Structure formats: C-alpha cells, structure tokens
C-alpha cells in the first residue's frame, strides 16, 4: 500500500492535482473503471479501504457505491513508473458500472476474467435444482463422485496428449478444468487458493 512519503512523491502538479486512477479487479484482472483522485480522496481510499474519487462533475469527494452499495474494496494501489497515474486493485461488491455490468468497459473481459465468472457461476449452482443443472447434480452426488470425475477427465486428458491429438487434448483439458473447479468449490476452495500455493512454491 502507498505510504505517506510515496503519496508526496506522486507528480501532482503534472496532473493538475487530479491523479488518474485505473481500477482493476484484483482476481480476474478485468479493468473495471477509471476515475480521478486528489490527495484527500487518495488518503480516504487508503484509510477506509473503499475506493473514493473526486467527482469533477459534482465537485466533491465520491465513494464508489455510496448510494448503490456496490463498493470497490481496495486490495492494493500502485503508482506507475512516471508517478502520474495509479493502478488500484479492487474487490468489487456487485456490478461496477451504473448500467449494471461488471465493468464500465463491458463487454471487454480477459481470459482470466472468464474463469472468475465461471467460478462464480459454479458456486451458485450449489443451491440449484439437480434436475435442471448438471453441475448441481454433480454437487448432489457427493465429493467422492466429483473426485472420481476429476480422475477420469485427468486420464482422458493424458491419453489425448499421448497420441498427439491437439483437438481432443483441448476438449479434455476443458472438461478436466471444469470438474476440478467444481471439486474445489465443493471443498470451499477456489482458484485463488491454488494460485497462492503456486506462488509460495
């Protein structure tokens, strides 16, 4: 997180004391929005943990989500190499855009952003009707059955690679990823847990 010393080192004069801030989803990497912060807005953002801008149209401080409840919870914030732009990593509560989309730049989405949305969808299927959802049926079948499916798909993925069938390898890898994500959700885990463990190694 930015220190008071780093905040003072930002090139405020260059940007007329209105620092451009790009807000990026801390997990998916999707760019959510951009806005401007003066020093007060930046200090409030860091102290409150909720991204706060200076609204040039309203001429006042504005905490994203103050009326809708769709806050952008601050994870971290970084200056760029010229100290005239900030990148804020955030955990959004609800949609970011006032049009109801996840990003003000929708439908733009990264590949990792799709995985994040898929993970949210799989989590929501835990309470769905097993008669109308294959994923819900998997959850209802229990952990052992889900784990068995991961094993089966892993074997099929390996066999496709062994015979150099790239098309089938892609298909089987997708099936394996899907079932692995279901298993992680079943165990109250997610891809972020796996990524953190990989970083530790």
UniProtKB/Swiss-Prot annotation:
Region spans: Phosphoribosyl-ATP pyrophosphohydrolase: 115-201
Enzyme class name: hydrolase
Pathway in which this enzyme or protein is active: Amino-acid biosynthesis; L-histidine biosynthesis; L-histidine from 5-phospho-alpha-D-ribose 1-diphosphate: step 2/9; Amino-acid biosynthesis; L-histidine biosynthesis; L-histidine from 5-phospho-alpha-D-ribose 1-diphosphate: step 3/9
Annotated localization: Cytoplasm
Pfam families for this protein: PRA-CH, PRA-PH
One cellular component term from this protein's GO annotations in UniProt: cytoplasm
Gene3D superfamilies named among the record's database cross-references: MazG-like (1.10.287.1080), Phosphoribosyl-AMP cyclohydrolase (3.10.20.810)
Catalytic reaction equation(s): 1-(5-phospho-beta-D-ribosyl)-ATP + H2O = 1-(5-phospho-beta-D-ribosyl)-5'-AMP + diphosphate + H(+); 1-(5-phospho-beta-D-ribosyl)-5'-AMP + H2O = 1-(5-phospho-beta-D-ribosyl)-5-[(5-phospho-beta-D-ribosylamino)methylideneamino]imidazole-4-carboxamide
GO biological process, one term: L-histidine biosynthetic process
An MF annotation (GO) of this entry: phosphoribosyl-ATP diphosphatase activity
Region entry Phosphoribosyl-AMP cyclohydrolase, spans: 1-114
Record family assignment: In the N-terminal section; belongs to the PRA-CH family.
Protein name: Histidine biosynthesis bifunctional protein HisIE
Source organism per UniProt: Photorhabdus laumondii subsp. laumondii (strain DSM 15139 / CIP 105565 / TT01) (Photorhabdus luminescens subsp. laumondii)
Top-level taxonomy: Bacteria, Pseudomonadati, Pseudomonadota, Gammaproteobacteria, Enterobacterales
This protein's encoding gene: hisI
């Amino acid at each position: 997180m930015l220190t008071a010393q780093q905040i003072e080192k930002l090139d405020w004069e260059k940007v007329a004391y209105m620092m451009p801030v790009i807000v990026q989803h801390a997990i998916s990497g999707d760019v959510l929005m951009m806005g401007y912060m003066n020093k007060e807005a930046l200090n409030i953002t860091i102290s409150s943990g909720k991204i706060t801008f200076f609204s040039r149209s309203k001429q006042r401080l504005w905490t994203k989500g103050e009326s809708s409840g769709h806050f952008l919870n601050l994870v971290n914030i970084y200056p760029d190499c010229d100290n005239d732009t900030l990148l804020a990593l955030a955990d959004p509560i609800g949609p970011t855009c006032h049009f109801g989309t996840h990003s003000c730049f929708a439908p733009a989405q990264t590949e990792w952003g799709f995985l994040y949305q898929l993970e949210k969808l799989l989590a929501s299927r835990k309470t769905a009707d097993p008669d109308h959802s294959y994923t819900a049926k998997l959850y209802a079948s229990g952990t052992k059955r889900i784990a068995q499916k991961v094993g089966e798909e892993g074997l099929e993925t390996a066999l496709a690679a062994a015979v150099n069938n790239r098309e089938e390898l892609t298909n089987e890898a997708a099936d394996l990823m899907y079932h692995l994500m279901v298993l992680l959700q079943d165990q109250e885990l997610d891809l972020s847990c796996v990524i953190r463990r990989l970083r530790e190694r």
